[in-house]
């Protein structure tokens, strides 16, 4: 039995190829059934995200194994083998285990240390467990990868610092306000970055979210998801005084929030502080706002500085995380080898039991026929000894004939002679 990991990701393949190799949730069961129908495949898990498609397999070793699996993948997706082959990576046993642990821990992600991948790996495992896993070693490998990912999160700072603009904006808000559960947040825009910000804020249970956008329809869809109120851009001047935090990201060519607007809001708030995070280019907030007392303005450049600092911290944490993965991989492979030995021990014990039962039955039959008990017992002991030492004796003789001192030493050691 061999463990394999093969696939493509954001580092080896462009998005147009990754799109063609993806497995949709609707066709996953069919794909797994087709994969398990291959004679060499014992069990499998398919991980398919926007940044990677990977097959984790337990297989029987055979000639042209790699060719057969690549051919299946290409045939299933209607791809040219050469197009896929140059982007495909292939890991076996130790390397396959290490790769899965790195993936689950976020060490192989586009954004180093991002936590979402662990949930995606768990879902892939759960989906594939519906009748497609079949192999305890494969299941154990995934369960181990989950515990390793948790250990990496617990023992390192790999996920402690923000490395995306959206996450950095939310982290900044949490640093300035002791608790977000008592603040009102005004989000200006409804694009991808604001969507991510809104979801982050929802996870931290902000008291109230208001979304201001040029088109109500797009903002309403996001508002329905995160439980926010929608207003028009023209309403910002009137509603700004309610906001403790303003995060803005639009495509407007001119600033949306001016110095005078913020001055009026601060006056109405009796100078309670306001945090303004402008992640738009061109800027949505007039730079002069940053000169106002109690108005704390951060631009996208400020966030990028935070991100670069945090990314350096994550890279340092990744070194520690890689050490954890190396250690855990070694321990898992030791367990896997022990499983192989356990099966051999079971087979050897079963074989010995069969010999014992066979010879004991013959001895009992001889006793029932009135044979001499002492002779029968001596005959049983002699035959049992000869049968049990026959195979080791042949191996010792063959090692001696071959002049293989190392094998002879191993055999002597295993028989307790050294």
UniProtKB/Swiss-Prot annotation:
- Catalytic activity annotation: (S)-4-amino-5-oxopentanoate + tRNA(Glu) + NADP(+) = L-glutamyl-tRNA(Glu) + NADPH + H(+)
Protein's pathway: Porphyrin-containing compound metabolism; protoporphyrin-IX biosynthesis; 5-aminolevulinate from L-glutamyl-tRNA(Glu): step 1/2
Q: Which UniProt keywords apply?
A: NADP, Oxidoreductase, Porphyrin biosynthesis
Q: What class of enzyme is it?
A: oxidoreductase
- Site, Important for activity: residue positions: 99
Q: Which InterPro entries has this protein been placed in? A: 4pyrrol_synth_GluRdtase (IPR000343), 4pyrrol_synth_GluRdtase_dimer (IPR015896), 4pyrrol_synth_GluRdtase_N (IPR015895), GluRdtase_CS (IPR018214), GluRdtase_dimer_dom_sf (IPR036453), GluRdtase_N_sf (IPR036343), NAD(P)-bd_dom_sf (IPR036291), Shikm_DH/Glu-tRNA_Rdtase (IPR006151)
Do the record's keywords include Nucleotide-binding?
no
GO function term, MF aspect, one: glutamyl-tRNA reductase activity
Catalytic residue list: 50 (nucleophile)
Positions annotated to bind NADP(+): 189-194
Pfam families cross-referenced by the UniProt entry: GlutR_dimer, GlutR_N, Shikimate_DH
Task: Tell me which EC number(s) this protein carries.
Answer: 1.2.1.70
The GO annotation for biological process reads: protoporphyrinogen IX biosynthetic process from glutamate
Q: How does it assemble?
A: Homodimer.
Job of this protein? Catalyzes the NADPH-dependent reduction of glutamyl-tRNA(Glu) to glutamate 1-semialdehyde (GSA).
Domain note? Possesses an unusual extended V-shaped dimeric structure with each monomer consisting of three distinct domains arranged along a curved 'spinal' alpha-helix. The N-terminal catalytic domain specifically recognizes the glutamate moiety of the substrate. The second domain is the NADPH-binding domain, and the third C-terminal domain is responsible for dimerization.
Q: Which HAMAP family match?
A: Glu_tRNA_reductase
State what protein this is by name: Glutamyl-tRNA reductase
From the broadest rank down, the organism's phylogenetic lineage runs:
Bacteria, Pseudomonadati, Pseudomonadota, Gammaproteobacteria, Enterobacterales
Q: Which gene encodes it?
A: hemA
């Amino acid at each position: 039995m061999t463990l394999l990991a093969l696939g493509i990701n954001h580092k080896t393949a462009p998005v147009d190829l990754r799109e063609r190799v993806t497995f949709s949730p609707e066709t996953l069961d069919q794909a797994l059934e087709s994969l398990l129908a291959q004679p060499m495949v014992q069990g499998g898990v398919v991980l398919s995200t926007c940044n990677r498609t990977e097959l984790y397999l337990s297989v029987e070793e055979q000639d042209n194994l790699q060719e057969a699996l690549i051919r299946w993948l290409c045939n299933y997706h209607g791809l040219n083998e050469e197009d896929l082959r140059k982007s495909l990576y292939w890991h076996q046993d130790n390397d396959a285990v290490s790769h899965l642990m790195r993936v689950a821990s976020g060490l192989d992600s586009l954004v180093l240390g991002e936590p979402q991948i662990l949930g995606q790996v768990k879902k892939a495992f759960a989906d594939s467990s519906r009748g497609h896993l079949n192999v305890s070693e494969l299941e154990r490998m995934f369960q181990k990868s989950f515990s390793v990912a948790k250990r990496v999160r617990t023992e390192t700072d790999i996920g402690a610092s923000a490395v995306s603009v959206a996450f950095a904006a939310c982290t900044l808000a949490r640093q300035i306000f002791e608790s977000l559960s008592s603040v009102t947040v005004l989000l200006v825009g409804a694009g991808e970055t604001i969507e991510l910000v809104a979801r982050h804020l929802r996870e931290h249970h902000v008291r109230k979210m208001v979304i201001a956008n040029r088109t109500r329809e797009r903002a309403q869809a996001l508002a329905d998801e995160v439980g926010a109120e929608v207003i028009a851009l023209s309403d910002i001047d009137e509603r700004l005084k309610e906001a403790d935090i303003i995060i803005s990201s639009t495509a407007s060519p001119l600033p949306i929030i001016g110095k005078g607007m913020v001055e009026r809001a601060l006056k109405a708030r009796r100078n309670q502080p306001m945090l303004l995070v402008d992640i738009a280019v061109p800027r949505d907030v007039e730079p002069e706002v940053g000169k106002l007392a109690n108005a704390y303005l951060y631009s996208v450049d400020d966030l990028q500085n935070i991100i670069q600092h945090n990314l350096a911290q994550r890279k340092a944490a990744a070194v520690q995380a890689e050490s954890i993965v190396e250690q855990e991989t070694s321990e898992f492979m030791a367990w896997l080898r022990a499983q192989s030995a356990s099966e051999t021990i079971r087979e050897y014990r079963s074989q010995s039991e069969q010999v014992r039962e066979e010879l004991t039955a013959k001895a009992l039959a001889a006793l029932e026929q009135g044979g001499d008990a002492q002779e029968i017992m001596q005959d049983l002991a002699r035959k049992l000894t000869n049968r049990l030492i026959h195979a080791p004796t042949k191996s010792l003789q063959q090692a001696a004939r071959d002049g293989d001192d190392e094998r002879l030493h191993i055999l002597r050691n295993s028989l307790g002679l050294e």
